């Protein structure tokens, strides 16, 4: 287990995150758990689980119970931290400063209109939902041994209403 890469949090670099983030990340580090392990234990997708840690997704009552058990955090305390609604989108500056997050922003900046055009041709006038939405990250290794990140976005298509 000592060879595992773990995402941690320096809360001083992220002052806009909710107080729950520091508590969750501290317990995660103490238990030496990856998001994949935590997600498996609570029955959620690892990106959705990480979003709870960053205050960008709502934890269900069942999530809170399971997170409490997995991370060893008092249930009532964790419930008090996570029972509200997320204040999404305030956790970082814009454009993002972190290189990986900036590259995700850059992908949308560079290919956004191309995505839009292709989606409009396939589905008509509308948008892809980020609410009726799921995402996942997978790792692929090619024949030369190079690692590739495979990010999948799956959003419900919402046609614009005519009125």
From Swiss-Prot:
<comment type="function">
    <text>Catalyzes the reaction of cyanate with bicarbonate to produce ammonia and carbon dioxide.</text>
</comment>
<dbReference type="GO" id="GO:0008824">
    <property type="term" value="F:cyanate hydratase activity"/>
</dbReference>
<dbReference type="GO" id="GO:0009439">
    <property type="term" value="P:cyanate metabolic process"/>
</dbReference>
<dbReference type="Pfam" id="PF02560">
    <property type="entry name" value="Cyanate_lyase"/>
</dbReference>
<comment type="similarity">
    <text>Belongs to the cyanase family.</text>
</comment>
<dbReference type="InterPro" id="IPR008076">
    <property type="entry name" value="Cyanase"/>
</dbReference>
<dbReference type="InterPro" id="IPR010982">
    <property type="entry name" value="Lambda_DNA-bd_dom_sf"/>
</dbReference>
<dbReference type="GO" id="GO:0003677">
    <property type="term" value="F:DNA binding"/>
</dbReference>
<dbReference type="InterPro" id="IPR036581">
    <property type="entry name" value="Cyanate_lyase_C_sf"/>
</dbReference>
<dbReference type="InterPro" id="IPR003712">
    <property type="entry name" value="Cyanate_lyase_C"/>
</dbReference>
<protein>
    <recommendedName>
        <fullName>Cyanate hydratase</fullName>
        <ecNumber>4.2.1.104</ecNumber>
    </recommendedName>
</protein>
<feature type="active site">
    <location>
        <position position="103"/>
    </location>
</feature>
<feature type="active site">
    <location>
        <position position="106"/>
    </location>
</feature>
<keyword id="KW-0456">Lyase</keyword>
<feature type="active site">
    <location>
        <position position="129"/>
    </location>
</feature>
């Amino acid at each position: 287990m000592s060879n595992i890469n773990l995402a941690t949090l320096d809360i001083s670099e992220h002052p806009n995150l909710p107080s729950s983030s520091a508590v969750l990340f501290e317990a995660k580090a103490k238990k030496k758990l990856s998001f994949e392990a935590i997600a498996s234990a609570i029955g959620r997708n690892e990106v959705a689980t990480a979003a709870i840690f960053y205050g960008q997704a709502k934890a269900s009552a069942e999530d809170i119970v399971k997170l409490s058990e997995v991370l060893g955090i008092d249930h009532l305390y964790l419930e008090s931290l996570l029972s509200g609604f997320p204040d999404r989108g305030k956790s970082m500056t814009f454009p993002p400063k972190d290189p990986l997050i900036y590259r995700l922003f850059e992908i949308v900046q560079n290919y956004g209109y191309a995505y839009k055009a292709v989606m409009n041709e396939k589905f008509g006038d509308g948008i892809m939902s980020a609410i009726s939405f799921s995402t996942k990250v997978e790792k692929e290794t090619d024949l030369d041994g190079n690692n590739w990140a495979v990010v999948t976005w799956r959003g419900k298509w919402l046609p614009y209403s005519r009125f």
